[in-house]
Structure formats: C-alpha cells, structure tokens
Amino acid sequence: MAPRKRNRHALGFLCCFGGSDLPEINLKDNNPLQFLDFTVPIPPTEELNARFSELVDELDLTDKNREAMFALPPEKKWQIYCSKKKEQEDPNKLATSWPDYYIDRINSMAAMQTLYAFDEEETEMKNKIVEDLKTALRTQPMRFVMRFIELDGLSCLLNFLKSMDYETSESRIHTSVIGCIKALMNNSQGRAHVLAHPESINIISQSLRTENIKTKIAVLEILGAVCLVPDGHKKVLQAMLHYQVYAAERTRFQTLLNELDRSMGRYRDEVNLKTAIMSFINAVLNAGAGEDNLEFRLHLRYEFLMLGIQPVIDKLREHENATLDRHLDFFEMVRNEDDLELAKRFDLIHIDTKSASQMFELIKKRLKHTDAYPYLLSILQHCLQMPYKRNGGNFQQWQLLDRILQQIVLQDERGDDPDIAPLENFNVKNIIKMLVNENEVKQWRDQAEKFRKDHAELMSKLEKKERECETKTQEKDEMMKTLNKMKDKLQKESLELRQARDQMNDLVAQLNEYSQGGSISFPAPPPPPPGGPLALSSALSSALTSENLPPLPPPLPFSSCPPPPAPPPPPGGPPPPPGAPPFFSLGVPPPSTTTFSSAGTSLKKKSIPQPSHPLKSFNWAKLSEERIHGTIWNEIDDLKAFKVLDLEDFEKMFSAYQRHQKEMGSTEDLYLSTRKVKELSVIDGRRAQNCVILLSKLKLSNEEIRQAILKMDEQEDLAKDMLEQLLKFVPEKSDTDLLEEHKHEIERMARADRFLFEMSRIDHYQQRLQALFFKKKFPERLAEAKPKVEAILLASKELIRSKRLRQLLEVVLAFGNYMNKGQRGSAYGFKVSSLNKIADTKSSIDRNITLLHYLIMIFEKNYPDILDIQTELQHLPEAAKVNLVELEKEVNNIKTGLKAVEAELDYQKRRIRESGDRFVPVMSDFITVASFSFSELEDLLNDARDKYAKALKHFGENEGKMQPDEFFGIFDTFLQSFAEAKQDLENMRKKKEEEERRARMEAMLKEQREKERRQKKAKAGSISEETGEFDDLVSALRSGEVFDKDLSKLKRNRKRSGNQGLETSRERVVTKLNY
C-alpha cells in the first residue's frame, strides 16, 4: 500500500474549524450598539489585561480568536469586559444562568411527551427552552459548559432524542436539540465528552430518519465534523452500521443515496441537503483511514458505486449550484486519482472494474508463475462448486466470500480494522499465520510434544535431584552442628577425665604411702565431675575412713573401657561421721535448719489505710501466709504504693453505693475402575484397589520401590506422605501365606498382589519402612517440639525476672487490700488468676471505666514504665499455647522411635547384607546425629520443667495442679485485656479532645460572627456605595465567587449605573463546507 501525497487544501472545505485567515470578531446583541458612559474608570493596563484574560479563558476561544481579542485596544477590552459582567449580573437572567434549569425542563419535556401531545403554543414554549440552552452553550462562560457536563446534560439530550415521538421528531424542537449537541461539540471539553460517550454518535445518527430537512443537515454536519476528529472516523462508520439496523436498511448508506437521488416535491430544489450529503460522503471517504490508505478508499467508494452514486452525481449537475458542483468535482477528482494509482500497479493506464474478464486476466497474469497460482485455481474450482440457483438464491455464501476478501484487504499488520462492516472479530493476520504451512506446523507440533515430554521428564528428575541435594545438605549441616557440639563436649569431658585421673593418681599415691605406715593429710578435694569419676572419687573418700584397707592395684593405662569399680569396704567398718555428705552428693551444702513456718516466724503486720466509706470488693483469691515464703510476694511491699496513690479519687471511682464445630465436609471415597482381565488376585478387593491408587501416584515400578527401600531412599524417590501411605499396605502374614502358595503364577498376579509379594521378599520390610519414615520425619518432629519447649523455658524466666510485673502486682495488691475487708482483706498476696478479675470491677461513676482502666491511668501518672510490660514478656503468647502433657507425650514417642531404630540397626548389623543394602551405614549416621539432637531436646525439656516449677513457686501456685497453657494463659489474657484497656482510654481521650475542639471552634465562630456583625453595624454608611461595589466585584471575580447566590443577591439590591454594556458572543459553529 503506497501512501499518496495529497494537497491538504483540497480537504480544506471539509474542516469545520475555520480557514487560515484571522477570524473576524463580531459583537451581537438584541439591542443596537450604543456608547456606554462608564462610572468605573479603566484600571491600569496590567490589571485590565489580567481581568480580560480571565474573561477570554471563560470563553474557550481558539488560538486565532484569542490573538484577535488580545489585539483590541484597551478601551474596547474594558467595554467588552464591563458588558459581559453586566450581562452576568442581570437579575432577569439569573434563573437561566445555570444548566440545572435547562436539564430539569428537558427531562420533564421528555416525560410529558409520552403522556400527551403538545399543542402549538406548548411546542413553541418548549422550543424556546431548547433554543435558550443552545444559545447558553455557545455564549455562556466555560464554567456553564463544565457544569452542564458534570450534571450529565449530554445524557439528558440523548435520552430526549431516543424517547421523542413522531410529532416531536418532525418539529423544530428536534432541530434545536441537535443544535444543542452541535453547540456543545464546538467547545473543546464538550466535544471530548460527546466523543467519549459510548452511544452518542449512534443516537445522533438515528435523527437521519426524520423528514425535517434542517435536522438532517445539522446531523450530517456533526457526523462530517466527527470524521475529521482523531478516532472519530471509525465511530461514524460504526454509527452508520447502527443506523442500518435501526432504519432496516438493506445496505449501509442506502438512506443517504436515496435522499441524494430524491427529486420530487420539496426535495426537488433542496440543494442544501444534497450539498450536506455530498460533503459527508467526501469526509467519510477521505478522512481517517482514507487519508493515506488507497485500499480503504477503493473499498468504501465501491460501496457507494454499488448503490448507484455515479448516475446520481450526473443528475445533480443539473442544479448548476457552484458549491454542490465543487463537492461533486472533488469526489470525481479523487476517484480518478485512485483509479490511476491502482492501474499503475498493473502497469496499465486504466482498469475496467466493471469487466470481470479483464480483472480475471490481470490476476491470472500476475499470479501465473507464482506459488499463489495453485490457490487461485483452487478458489476458482471451489467457486464452481458453490450452490447455484437461477433465481439468485443462496447469494449469502458469495456475500460471505466477498466480506472475507474485503477484510483481508483492509486489515492492517497490527490486526486493526478501519471498518468493521465486512466481518467483526475476524483477524486475518492470525489466520494467515495458522495457514503458513500446515505440514510444517504439524511437524513442529509433534516436535513440541516430544520436547514437552522430555522437558517434563527432565523436570521430574531435576526435582528429584533437588530434593535429594536438599536432604543431603540438611543432613550434612545437621551432622556438622552435631559434630561441633560433640567436639566441644569431648574436650570438656576429656579435661574432666584428666583431672579425675590426676586426682585418682594422687589418692593412689597417698594410699601407698599410708600402707607403708606414714601419716596422711588429705587436702580438700575439688568438686567432682559428674558420672563415673564422681562415683569413684566418692567411693575412695568414704573408704579412707575405714581400717584394714587392702592394697589397690596399680592404675590402669587410659583406655576407652571404664576402670573396674573399687572394692567395697570390709564389713564392720565404722559408720561415716555425723554430717558427712551422702555417697552421690554433689557438694551442695546442707539446707539451713531455719525453716519458715507460721509459728516460727511472724510476718510484719500491715497498716493499711481505711476508706471513708465501703468500696466495691475485688474478687481475688488470697494466698495463705504459709505459702508466702520463697515467692515474689516476699519482695513486694504494697505499703510503699499507698504513698503515691490518690485514695480519695479511688474511693469516688469504686464506691460500693453504685451499681468450632469443624464442619467435616462429607468425604467421598474415590474408587478407580479397573479393567476386568483374567488376572490372579488373592488380596481383599478394596485393599487391593487402594494399593493400586497409591502405586499410580508413586509412578515407580516395584523394583524401583524395592531398590529405594534397600538403599534407604538416598535419591529421595519416596516422599514422607508416600511412605506413610506405604506403611498402610505392609503385607500381613495371611497375605504372605496366600501369595507364597501362588508364587509360581507371579506373572498372572494383579498389580497390588505382585507388589505385596515382592515387598514381602525384603527382610524386615515393615521395620525398614518404619525406620525410613522415622528418619524422614525426625527433623520435622524435632523442629515442632523444640520451639514449644523453648517457649515454656523463656516465658518462665521472663515472669520471674520482670520488674514491671512486680511493680504492677504491688499496686494491685495495695488497691485490693484497700477495697476488701474482713477475711478477704489484709492479704500478703493473691493468686495470679485474680488478675483477670480486675476488669470485672466497674466504676460507680462511669460504667465504661473498670478497675483495669483506672490502674492504667495510675500507671500513666505514677508508674509509666509499667505500660511497656509486654516488652518484658514477649514469649507468653507462644507458651500459653503449649500443652505440656501432649509435648511430653510427643518427646516420649520420639524416644521410643529412636529405640526402635537402634534395635533394628542392631539386627541388621548381625545379619548378612545383600548387595545394595545401605541400611546399616545410612542409619548408623542418622542414629549418631539424632541421638545427640534428642538428648539436647531432653535436657532443654528438663530445664523448662525446672524453670516452670520455679515460676509456679515464685507466684505461690501449687506445683502439679496447673499446666503451662493455663498458667501462662492467665498472664497472656491479662496482657491482652491490658492492651485493650489502654486503647480504650486512648479512644476516650481522642473523643473528648475532638468534642472539646469542636466546642472551641463553635465558640470561635459564634464570636467571629458577632464581631463581624458589630463591625458592619459600626461602619454602615462610612464607605461610598460605588467604592464598595467595585471592591466586592474585583474580589469576587478573583476568588471565583462572582456567581455565588449571596453575592448576586447583594448586587441586585444595589443601585447600578444606567450604562448599556456591549455583549460578546463566541459563535463556535461548525463551518459550512465552502471555498
């Protein structure tokens, strides 16, 4: 497609936005022009230009018109400005100065015309309303147009067009409504709004059906102008397709050609309509896609030629109208140029497009020796086979073929259609790509399928290798950690062993010396290490106190075997002296003989202030004095808190005188239907079917599964969940016996039977499978248990160490003793469960305030550090979720599993291994690492138990009666309530501050209004009327309040000068097509 350079002046008459000359500024008014005697002098040039610029901006003029306006002399500018302002301030025009009025009236007109027909007087009145709107859209400031758009005035006009009856459509009202849309489109913002509306152009095109000639002309001018707007050309073509359906046309543009050809009655001499139609046709042909696309112009022009436009053009020449003739000349001129350009492609001067034989010869000549020629023959051959009837029936197949060819010619490389008339959503480019080479595509498809399978297989292998690598890496890291810990432990124990050996050698030397009769002085031995050396050292120490000791054998050289135990002391030896440590004493000094008891020691009597009147009671659980010793309550002195607490305020606040069921979705068992073949099956049918389902998921042969189990799945073929499922299908003894009876028919066995038979041949298959599953599951189980143990340990430490918690309990104890009397009062401590009862005590003054809220207010005032208590107790939420019984049960299960693996490992070490069996080396490494990791978990659990027991004792709670989830849950719930109460107080403060701010603002506004009222009253009459109006007008103009209702009312009440203003109007009409 070769673009054709064209003289842009040839399209000049199509443009609806003016020519190249500067426009002439015309002033229109209903009254004749007269000179005005302005009382307000012309302002300085700078101020005048600023005001005039605001006025010109409101008019939304084109650049050329703006230049012409600014080129006016200052006196003319000031005259235009004052005239426009006078018009805006006219009291008679205020009601119609906003589009709301017009939109409401037109909506009511649309509703009323469906109820009854208008008489002539009503029609005239309605037409005047629409005409006034048209004038307002042309002459009112830009804000009027924007307000009209914001109020969806366009939809109001379009709805009127859609709903009007026949009489209205033939009346002047129809013409005026189209004129309103035309006026709106003369504004840049309005034009963009109309084009953006999805149905506007379609609805406008429906007005072509009227018999009103003026309406037809206005519609054609709009459609012709839209063709010249970016993205407008395609909308016009779509609108003509819409009109074809709306008007039941046989083909597109049929109505236009009929109107162009009509020469009877009032249409005989109606040159304006025919001129408008021809200008529209030229715009459709030469704008948009037709500007540079020869194929599009030929395509669309052929559509008009098929409708018979050429004889109509010849007939239109009889009118001898210069303007119409220019349109006709332009149509034929462009047609001749396009025909010549098409002929040049075939090296001809002219192509007779009416001759089928000539066109066929040209196509045949061009394609004769090309690869496309066979397809031309195929097309012709299939055309011969198309259905044929003498009466012209079955023409739709030919029509479809024609439209497909049209689409092929018109659609560009991007797949965009300049005209959707032939076939919508028909992408030629994609179809051509599909038909490039069917054999090649099939070959590529087969090759792609092969690549896809290879890719899937490689991805499967890669995933398997990645799993294997990840597992090996984890095992290596775990083994390195364990090895480092073992090295540290070995160095520590080697040092302890060396010290114990040195000590033992010293003792042996001393014994030898003693046996020779010397006196022995024993130095104080160092604290013995744990384990064997401790027992030996203790035994020797107690043996030294007896007589007639037999000589000890010489010390053995260091070896991995433990030394033999020392001989027991002879009977009859003296008993150990009083106060001597027991045999396995760890050197801990004996407990003090001073014991705490209520009889032995007395707690200092508390001097608690007494309230002036009864208070609400705090429902706590008081600890007995016997249980105070050794707890946190020993360190708390609530009497110190009374020194800083405001007890009087507290009395006012708390006076006694006031008031999953988890929905189990029904699970359906899945059964796979298997082919009924003659195969041997001795296993239970349902069990065999489930086994087949599992094997199909594994995607491994029996031999691959067997090798994976023998090699302990070093290549990670078996996932944890698959191993768990395999454990459900371990061959039972009854299954094995039955399968053994038919082992000679192994080839006929069903898949499940053969699998179970082959697995039963593996020695200790079940134990191997269980050991492998335990090995894979061990890191996960350890990772789940360890954080729970750590949570209990850390939470216990945090509770014991928290200083903020100690302070909080001190204040709560003080308030509780102040509130409670009798048996509930004078407490030295309370149970921790009482913390969650603090929020149950509500204030007598404000029911929204609880004792917990009050405590937080006290903390904010006197103990601000307590407010951050949660930072000291970060592990409480996790610890509150731990069930110690379940945790210990899980740890014991892990321990049992480890013992079972060790037992199986011992068995496998004793038997002769078959080739490829990797159980012993793999599980030996695993047991080494797992045993050490588990011992760490056990030690951590023991530490957590001890710390938890200390925490219970620290708070005076009974050991064994409260589980961690309950104990830590109490504190966790309290901290949550604490945080919620803090947020409540914050919200209350914000609400109170907002109310106070609002009250202050109202008071300030009231005071300001009163002040302004007094000032106005004081200054009344002091300023001249003219000066006040001038200042108010300038201020309102600059602030954009010039059209405010209050200001307008103010100006109407003032006396104005009797000057007549000049009115400017901005007639931005669509230029008629002319030269």
UniProtKB/Swiss-Prot annotation:
Belongs to the formin homology family. SUPFAM superfamilies: ARM repeat, Formin homology 2 domain (FH2 domain). It comes from Gallus gallus (Chicken). Expressed in progenitor populations of the embryonic spinal cord (at protein level). Keywords: Actin-binding, Coiled coil, Wnt signaling pathway. Pfam families: Drf_FH3 (PF06367), Drf_GBD (PF06371), FH2 (PF02181). The DAD domain regulates activation via by an autoinhibitory interaction with the GBD/FH3 domain. This autoinhibition is released upon competitive binding of an activated GTPase. The release of DAD allows the FH2 domain to then nucleate and elongate nonbranched actin filaments. One of its GO terms (molecular function) is small GTPase binding. Residues 1025-1075 form the DAD domain. Key regulator of the Wnt signaling pathway, which is required for various processes during development, such as dorsal patterning, determination of left/right symmetry or myelination in the central nervous system. Acts downstream of Wnt ligands and upstream of beta-catenin (CTNNB1). Required for canonical Wnt signaling pathway during patterning in the dorsal spinal cord by promoting the aggregation of Disheveled (Dvl) complexes, thereby clustering and formation of Wnt receptor signalosomes and potentiating Wnt activity. Residues 1064-1075 have a biased composition (Basic and acidic residues). Residues 517-611, 1006-1025, 1048-1075 are annotated as: Disordered. Residues 533-544 have a biased composition (Low complexity). Residues 523-532, 550-581 have a biased composition (Pro residues). It comes from the Eukaryota. GO terms for biological process: actin cytoskeleton organization; dorsal spinal cord development; negative regulation of oligodendrocyte differentiation; positive regulation of canonical Wnt signaling pathway; regulation of canonical Wnt signaling pathway; regulation of non-canonical Wnt signaling pathway; Wnt signaling pathway. Residues 40-416 form the GBD/FH3 domain. SMART domains: Drf_FH3, Drf_GBD, FH2. This is Disheveled-associated activator of morphogenesis 2. Residues 437-517 form a coiled coil. Residues 605-1075 form the FH2 domain.
